[in-house]
């Protein structure tokens, strides 16, 4: 027999599906939420639903956007000759926090991982190749987390792009298997400054 009422148990179950939320955190969040005023919960639910319905992907770089082009792609002050390739929108956010990078981005939407059934076809690799060729990009910076999948993706994408442009990768002060989103701004800034050509 559960100590929770069915609606509360269902809420806890759904909260546990969020990244980094275990049973105890889900319980704490659920109990907090049900004690909030109904108007506050309604506003929260409305904001959540609106974000899900209105936030999509930029048609150029595949970063998060509620319009055809994201804020970064629309910014005329950005260096349009440089594209930083990342796996996930969280990586764009992490790099933007450094305030060091002034170019554009391309979000692959994941990493090549044959064990998980993810090949280049499931990612935005071909869109990147077309973009680099059409826009006559001067440099592509590979800013992919250092893992087996990250290395595979970096080398694969780098080989495809070499006929069109200079391909570099950020230098890493990150441990192998570390994620960009967890790195501090100083580490990321140094990694951008220390990038080197892909061999």
UniProtKB/Swiss-Prot annotation:
SUPFAM superfamilies: Recombination protein RecR (SSF111304). A zinc finger (C4-type) spans 58-73. Residues 81-175 form the Toprim domain. One of its GO terms (molecular function) is DNA binding. The keyword Zinc-finger applies. Pfam families: RecR_C, RecR_HhH, RecR_ZnF, Toprim_4. PROSITE patterns: RECR, TOPRIM. One of its GO terms (biological process) is DNA recombination. The keyword Transferase does not apply. It comes from the Bacteria. Keywords: DNA damage, DNA recombination, DNA repair, Metal-binding, Zinc, Zinc-finger. May play a role in DNA repair. It seems to be involved in an RecBC-independent recombinational process of DNA repair. It may act with RecF and RecO. Belongs to the RecR family. This is Recombination protein RecR. It comes from Synechococcus elongatus (strain ATCC 33912 / PCC 7942 / FACHB-805). The lineage of its organism: Bacteria, Bacillati, Cyanobacteriota, Cyanophyceae, Synechococcales.
